[in-house]
């Protein structure tokens, strides 16, 4: 029984050591790959599309507002057959930005009173 227990501890130790070595090798490979990608990276920042402008050609390049990114929303106007897509801010995000702005102002007042 003691032999089986010692053999099991030996196997667990050996397995943990070998897996740690493999993880170190993977981490080094990931770092090298990341560095090569950073070196090859080109400037790819495009101009963002302002709110209420057409975004049908690129739905992921809407501009950011103060806190959140605008969303490309598509709809059919009344009596029209063509789909229109524009960058818009969803109402719930608009209300969240207003609440955050009021909280900032209130925090500034409290800081002024006690600071």
UniProtKB/Swiss-Prot annotation:
Propeptide, chain numbering: 21-44
Q: Name one GO molecular function term.
A: toxin activity
Gene Ontology CC = extracellular region
Q: Keywords assigned by UniProt?
A: Disulfide bond, Knottin, Secreted, Signal, Toxin
Tissue occurrence: Expressed by the venom gland.
Q: Does the keyword Disulfide bond apply?
A: yes
Q: Name one Pfam family in it.
A: Toxin_35
Xref: PROSITE patterns: SPIDER_CSTX (PS60029)
Q: Where in the cell is it found?
A: Secreted
Key word Transmembrane present in the record?
no
Name which cysteines form disulfide bonds.
Answer: 48-63, 55-72, 62-87, 74-85
Leader sequence range is 1-20
Q: What is known of its domains?
A: The presence of a 'disulfide through disulfide knot' structurally defines this protein as a knottin.
Record family assignment: Belongs to the neurotoxin 19 (CSTX) family. 01 subfamily.
Record protein name field? U3-lycotoxin-Ls1i
Q: Which organism is it from?
A: Lycosa singoriensis (Wolf spider)
């Amino acid at each position: 029984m003691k032999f089986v227990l010692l053999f099991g501890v030996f196997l667990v130790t050996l397995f943990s050591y070998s897996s740690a070595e493999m993880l170190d090798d993977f981490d080094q490979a990931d770092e090298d790959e990341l560095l090569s990608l950073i070196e090859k990276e080109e400037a790819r920042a495009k101009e963002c599309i302002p709110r209420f402008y057409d975004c049908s050609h690129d739905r992921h390049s809407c501009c950011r507002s103060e806190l959140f990114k605008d969303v490309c929303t598509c709809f059919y106007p009344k009596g029209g057959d063509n789909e229109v897509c524009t960058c818009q801010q969803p109402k719930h995000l608009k209300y969240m930005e207003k609440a955050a702005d009021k909280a900032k102002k209130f925090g500034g007042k409290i800081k002024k009173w006690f600071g």
